[in-house]
Amino acid sequence: MAKIKKDDLVQVISGKDKGKQGKVLRVFPTDERVLVEGVNRVTKHLRAGQDNNGSTEGGLQVVEAPIHISNVAVVDPETKKPTRVGYRFETVEKDGVTKTVKVRFAKASGKEL
C-alpha cells in the first residue's frame, strides 16, 4: 500500500534528480511507481506516422518517466523538508453526528496532509 497519493508534494531522495521537488501527477500502485512533475525527464523518439487526428511529425519529445516510490518522500507542509507519513484516527462532529475518520499526517511535525 502506497502512502503517496496524487497531488502530494514530494522530494526525490535518491537518483539523478536527488533534491528536486514536484507534484505527483499519477500513481501506479501495481508497479510501485509515481509520475512526478519535472522529475526524471527523458527524451522520447517519435516516429512519423498516423494518429486519430491524421498524420503526425516525427522527432524528439521530452516527457516525465515514472520513478520508483521508494525514491521519493512526501514534503512536510510546515518545514518544507521530506518526512514520513503516518495515519491516525480523529473524531469529527458534523451536524450532531460524531464520526471517526482516518487522517494522513507528517510524522516530523504532526501536521495533517
Curated annotation (Swiss-Prot):
One of its GO terms (molecular function) is structural constituent of ribosome. Part of the 50S ribosomal subunit. Coiled coil: none annotated. CDD domains: KOW_RPL26. One of its GO terms (cellular component) is ribonucleoprotein complex. Keywords: Ribonucleoprotein, Ribosomal protein, RNA-binding, rRNA-binding. One of two assembly initiator proteins, it binds directly to the 5'-end of the 23S rRNA, where it nucleates assembly of the 50S subunit. One of the proteins that surrounds the polypeptide exit tunnel on the outside of the subunit. The keyword Transmembrane helix does not apply. It holds the Pfam family ribosomal_L24. GO terms for biological process: translation. The keyword Ribosomal protein applies. Belongs to the universal ribosomal protein uL24 family. It comes from the Bacteria. This is Large ribosomal subunit protein uL24. It comes from Micrococcus luteus (Micrococcus lysodeikticus). The gene is rplX. PROSITE patterns: RIBOSOMAL_L24 (PS01108).
